């Protein structure tokens, strides 16, 4: 998919780029698979800001995606490739032979007219097919991976991402995650074969503030531009550097400080992600 640039007829357009929509074939979304999500805009039930730099953004409908891929042994055909405003990859509309329609994340290379299947075992290693990890050979590239059997895919779902099966050990499969982390996943978990499409998403440049406002992202004020009451970096006469190490507004170190809580699932991580 090509990255589209624009003529610099305004300064904001000079470095702006976007993805070509030539791969989108769907004319209209399936209404039964659309819902309207409430917009919190970073506020809690008291109306107070709990997550900064968020707003409503452009109006959009959420597409109900089949992350579980649990329609076993029924053939489906790709009817359309569509844009999804809630994610950075494309989605594929699947028409099953029994009449049901579902959306799935579009793997790279999946096009209109292709056939997809889901089964617990016994399928060919083909892009878009979904099965349990225990049925896939070592070296298979997968995405939309479950962390708990039957819970639906949670790992490797964004544009251009994938994981690779590196080995087996007892009831676990060893996966190399997109970050480089090596971890165990139960062999009963489902996954979809292939790499998530829209790989060029990482190459686009937002270019102007208005596009981020449409995405629901508000401007971020530097701590050094605030008063001491508002931020540890605030205050001083004129432009002054902060004393000590950079911290968040609440005093947590901002550079390299680990904030991840310990979990029981830490034992399933073989090696941490690459530095």
UniProtKB/Swiss-Prot annotation:
PROSITE patterns: RIBOSOMAL_L2 (PS00467). One of the primary rRNA binding proteins. Required for association of the 30S and 50S subunits to form the 70S ribosome, for tRNA binding and peptide bond formation. It has been suggested to have peptidyltransferase activity; this is somewhat controversial. Makes several contacts with the 16S rRNA in the 70S ribosome. It holds the Pfam family Ribosomal_L2_C. InterPro entries: NA-bd_OB-fold, Rib_uL2_dom2, Ribosomal_uL2, Ribosomal_uL2_bac/org-type, Ribosomal_uL2_C, Ribosomal_uL2_CS, Ribosomal_uL2_dom3, Ribosomal_uL2_RNA-bd_dom. Part of the 50S ribosomal subunit. Forms a bridge to the 30S subunit in the 70S ribosome. This is Large ribosomal subunit protein uL2. One of its GO terms (biological process) is cytoplasmic translation. It comes from the Bacteria. GO terms for molecular function: rRNA binding; structural constituent of ribosome; transferase activity. Keywords: Ribonucleoprotein, Ribosomal protein, RNA-binding, rRNA-binding. Residues 257-275 have a biased composition (Basic residues). SMART domains: Ribosomal_L2 (SM01383), Ribosomal_L2_C (SM01382). Belongs to the universal ribosomal protein uL2 family. It comes from Helicobacter hepaticus (strain ATCC 51449 / 3B1). Coiled coil: none annotated. Residues 210-275 are annotated as: Disordered. GO terms for cellular component: large ribosomal subunit.
